[in-house]
């Protein structure tokens, strides 16, 4: 499909051996795609490899153009935005300054438009622009890192563990925003340990465990047939 980010045959090694083995995932435009799996499945390693942070084998095809092996800034410039696990930001700077840093590669006009777009998605941050990022609540910090990723108006957005450490009410606020982003034409990959967080907003889903894909298909199939989670996602007997 035109506009798709395709991760093809990705293998990632850390330490003694591979933690991701020959994984292929399609992230089409205008949809939220879920990547599910237990802790240690290799999901975060895959995302870091896509972003050019970890060495890997395979292809990262952005609308047919292979970005594999490119430097992180080249990958971002091609329209791939990644929100890694852990809510990484400059905690000693204000919210406004963090957004300015995220705009460093943009023209003045694009930076102004991107910032306005991000604050439209997360109006809660408008009142906190002068607050230090480190003083924000966990939910506000997650909004900030999402806003930082979105100021550049990416074609694809990869979000790792959106719900980690957040109260359910905060997650309920954030997840629909990803659907709004997708409806604007962005291809969104939502990586989650907790299946229920991602399945409600996703159209397609992949289940990963021990570095391999064990299920790929419509998210509705996992919602309607929860036993599939127990046979693929829950090989270790743990439910999410």
What are these regions (language model features)?
Residues 2-240:
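Glycine-rich phosphate-binding loops of nucleotide-dependent enzymes
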């Amino acid at each position: 499909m035109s506009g798709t980010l395709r991760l093809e045959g990705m293998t990632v090694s850390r330490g003694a051996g591979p933690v991701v083995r020959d994984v292929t995932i399609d992230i089409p435009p205008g949809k939220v795609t879920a990547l599910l799996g237990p802790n240690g499945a290799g999901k975060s390693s895959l995302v870091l490899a896509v972003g050019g942070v970890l060495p890997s084998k395979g292809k990262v095809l952005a609308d047919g153009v292979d970005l594999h092996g490119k430097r992180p800034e080249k990958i971002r410039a091609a329209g791939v935005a990644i929100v890694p696990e852990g809510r990484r930001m400059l905690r000693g700077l204000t919210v406004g300054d963090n957004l300015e840093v995220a705009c460093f590669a943009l023209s003045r006009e694009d930076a102004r438009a991107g910032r306005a777009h991000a604050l439209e998605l997360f109006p809660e941050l408008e009142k906190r622009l002068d607050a230090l990022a480190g003083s924000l609540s966990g939910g506000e910090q997650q909004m900030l890192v999402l806003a930082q990723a979105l100021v550049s108006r990416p074609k694809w957005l990869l979000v790792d563990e959106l719900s980690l450490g957040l109260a359910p009410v905060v997650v309920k606020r954030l997840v629909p925003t990803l659907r709004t982003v997708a409806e604007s034409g962005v291809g969104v990959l939502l990586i989650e340990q907790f299946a229920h967080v991602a399945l409600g907003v996703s159209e397609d889903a992949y289940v990963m465990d021990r570095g391999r894909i064990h299920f790929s298909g419509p998210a509705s199939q996992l919602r309607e047939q929860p036993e599939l989670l127990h046979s693929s996602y829950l090989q270790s007997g743990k439910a999410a």
